[in-house]
């Protein structure tokens, strides 16, 4: 019984860390990366459509993204959506493709991005701790129902805490790497 709870705990904590990693991918670190545009949605035929479903996104140079729309009539809408996403970039179009020059980050902007990364890290840690709380509640219910003994409850709770510590340290490690990447000039 308690093994099922531990398995679910591990899966949910893994998902929380994976979600955090995806969130970090959208934080710009001076180099062009197609994931920068992952959250951009375009008003296309009356529906909000992710940009990566309407176009291909390439990186021809270290500080340049090229968006090639599958439907050339959507270029204006795509440009507006990129501007509206407030990514700190300005798209330029030649009628068939959209070029996005990634400006070098200023020291001030780097520090702002580090704060954003730390905020995301804290949210991810809270998510992991919420999983811990839910798992401990589930274990207590099992013990109350007589499915596990008090000793098994204590041992399982310690295992849940070890998992929590492991995933929080993973978050810290990923955060440290991202901060280093951002502060790199």
Swiss-Prot record:
Coiled coil residues, start to end: none
GO terms of molecular function: ribosomal large subunit binding
Annotated localization: Cytoplasm
A cellular component annotation (GO) from this entry: cytoplasm
Keywords: Cytoplasm, Protein biosynthesis
Gene Ontology terms describing biological process: translational termination
Region entry Disordered, spans: 136-155
HAMAP family with a match to the protein in the record: RRF
Function statement: Responsible for the release of ribosomes from messenger RNA at the termination of protein biosynthesis. May increase the efficiency of translation by recycling ribosomes from one round of translation to another.
Record family assignment: Belongs to the RRF family.
Protein name: Ribosome-recycling factor
Gene (name only): frr
């Amino acid at each position: 019984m308690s093994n099922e709870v531990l398995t679910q705990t591990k899966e949910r904590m893994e998902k929380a860390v994976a979600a955090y990693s995806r969130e970090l991918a959208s934080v710009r670190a001076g180099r062009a990366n197609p994931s920068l545009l992952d959250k951009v949605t375009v008003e296309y035929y009356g529906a909000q459509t992710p940009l990566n479903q309407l176009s291909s996104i390439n990186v021809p140079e270290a500080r340049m993204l090229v968006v090639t729309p599958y439907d050339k009539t959507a270029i204006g809408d795509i440009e507006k959506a990129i501007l509206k996403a407030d990514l700190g970039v300005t798209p330029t179009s030649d009628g068939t493709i959209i070029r996005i020059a990634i400006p070098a980050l200023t020291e001030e902007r780097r520090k702002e991005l580090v704060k954003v990364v730390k905020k995301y890290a804290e949210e991810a840690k809270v998510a992991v701790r919420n999983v811990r709380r839910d798992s401990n509640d589930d274990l207590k219910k099992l013990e109350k129902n007589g499915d596990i003994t008090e000793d098994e409850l204590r041992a399982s709770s310690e295992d849940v805490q070890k998992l929590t510590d492991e995933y929080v340290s993973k978050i810290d490690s990923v955060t440290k790497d991202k901060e280093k990447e951002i502060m790199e000039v």
